[in-house]
A protein has these predicted regions:
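Substrate-binding/active-site groove segments that recognize
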Residues: 120-143, 154-163, 181-182, 200-203
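Acidic helix/loop microenvironments that form the catalytic cleft of cell-wall polysaccharide enzymes
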Residues: 110-115, 154-158, 168-194, 199-206, ...
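Surface-exposed patches in mature extracellular/periplasmic domains of secreted proteins
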Residues: 100-108, 146, 168-176, 215-216
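Cell-wall glycan-active module
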Residues: 1-107, 201-233
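Second-shell loop/turn segments in exported
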Residues: 71, 75-83, 92-97, 118-123, ...
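Extended amphipathic alpha-helical interaction segments
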Residues: 103, 116-118
């Protein structure tokens, strides 16, 4: 049968899409102090945090799928992922349509960043579903970070930029999303911050769950995903 997806158009007055010709300032992210080894040291003992490691994504996914420690990452529940899709799935699809970032990957980031809470603000000032700091929101054309459509569009655009900037490496892209791309560049890989070293495997493990909500399971974070609950026909 023919598959159709109903995606609502962007409302008049919404923040514009980011200018692809604008080069973000990689020094804009704040410095964070170096921290001791994270609770996810078991993950990094197998997966190299350094820049330029081929095959890292496959290695990370295999390790997360097999290691018993994965269950200790305090992952979102599958029911939470489903609820986010029901509430914001159309905005996620609209923001990832035609991009190199899977809707399931964006879903995983939302689940870890905010648990689907639209108006949450972190202690560091990150805002909304994808926890955009004000400077990042401005970079990617987000006028109202508490508007779900704008926030998701900005976060998805930032993920896409990070994937391109780090040559399609999801591990470095996630590290950049959490710590800032400048921190990744300065560290020569995933910075040795507890928060970042825990964040990367947590999002990747959540991605393994999120892709189960797609009509066809994506293998790569760049593969397309249509959420089963939004498919008709």
């Amino acid at each position: 049968p023919r598959i159709t997806i109903q995606i609502e158009p962007r409302e008049p007055g919404a923040a514009p899409y980011p200018d692809p010709n604008r080069v973000p300032d990689v020094t804009a992210e704040p410095e964070r102090p170096l921290e001791p080894d994270s609770a996810a040291a078991w993950f990094w003992s197998v997966v190299s945090p350094q820049i330029g490691v081929p095959g890292r994504y496959d290695q990370a996914i295999a390790h997360l799928s097999e290691a018993p420690q994965t269950r200790d990452l305090r992952l979102p529940r599958f029911e939470d992922l489903t609820a986010i899709v029901q509430a914001h799935g159309r905005e996620i699809l609209a923001s990832t349509a035609g991009s190199d970032v899977s809707a399931a990957f964006v879903l995983a980031v939302i689940a870890v960043e905010s648990a689907g809470r639209v108006e949450v603000v972190s202690h560091a000032g990150a805002q909304g579903l994808m926890q955009l700091i004000p400077a990042t929101a401005e970079r990617f054309g987000v006028g109202d970070p508490f508007d779900p459509g704008q926030n998701i569009a900005g976060g998805a655009a930032y993920l896409s930029w990070l994937m391109e900037n780090f040559n399609g490496d999801p591990v470095l892209a996630l590290a950049g999303y959490n710590a800032g791309e400048g921190a990744v560049a300065r560290a020569g890989g995933v910075p040795n911050y507890d928060e970042t070293r825990d964040y990367v495997p947590k999002v990747l493990a959540t991605w393994l769950m999120a892709r189960q909500l797609c009509t066809r399971r994506p293998d790569l974070v760049s593969d397309p995903c249509l959420f089963t609950t939004l498919v008709s026909g």
